[in-house]
Regions:
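Beta-propeller-forming repeat regions
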Residues: 1-218
Length: 218
């Protein structure tokens, strides 16, 4: 076990209970944040992205020898959303550079997932631009995690999004909700319809592909 004083990773994710914000009202309260490991600047070393529920997310650059540097602001990781959950590294636009997708499951105004597209590496530091809205991936559901894969075998990466309603279990009853789609809690499948390497465009094909999207998405 290496201390933060050696590694430079001083990140701590604290879940602070409040009178109206706790495990009794939100069953996913202790699900925690997320971690992604991958090479964001193509130097052969594994870098680290960690998400927080209450504080800022962090991107750490691996300097070698188990030493890391916080490059969050320098890399353009801005626009904090409340209650970040899962984070995924993937080369979304196929340009050979690692992009970042962050899931957010907070209050209405601070929800909306984020897509950081790698604009290139300068001085060993990756430069990112947030492009979720224009790419069609700024989903406003209660997202837990996302996975990128080529589901239609056309050579580019599509995305499956795992959502999960915060509705307490005792409120669900015994009704079969599988065929009832839920905007916030239902899982979704997004097809990559990007026409070229510069423009990024995803289409929600959940219903067409037969993805059940009930409020029990986990």
């Amino acid at each position: 076990e290496l201390p933060a004083s050696e590694t430079g990773i001083d990140f701590v994710n604290r879940s602070l209970e409040k009178k109206e914000f706790n495990i009794f009202n939100y069953r996913n309260f202790y699900n925690g944040g997320g971690v992604a490991i991958g090479d964001v600047n193509n130097d052969g070393l594994s870098d680290l992205f960690v998400t927080s529920n209450f504080e800022d997310n962090k991107l750490y650059l691996n300097k070698g020898g188990m030493h890391f540097e916080d490059i969050t602001k320098q890399a353009g990781i801005v626009g904090k959303k409340f209650w970040s959950t899962g984070v995924t590294f993937a080369d979304v636009n196929g340009d050979g550079l690692m992009d970042i997708y962050v899931c957010n499951s907070g209050s209405r105004d601070a929800r909306g997932n984020q897509l950081y597209i790698n604009q290139g590496v300068k001085g060993g530091v990756p430069m990112y631009k947030e492009m979720a809205q224009e790419a069609g991936l700024a989903d406003g559901g209660l997202s837990t995690h996302a996975a990128f894969f080529d589901y239609d075998r056309d050579g580019d990466l599509d995305m499956y999004l795992l959502n999960n309603s915060f509705t307490p279990i005792d409120k669900l009853g015994y009704t079969n909700l599988r065929d009832m789609r839920d905007k916030l809690g239902g899982d979704k499948l997004f097809r990559n319809d990007s026409p070229d390497g510069k423009r990024i465009m995803f289409t929600d094909v959940s219903e067409k592909a037969g993805i059940y999207g009930s409020l029990i998405g986990f």
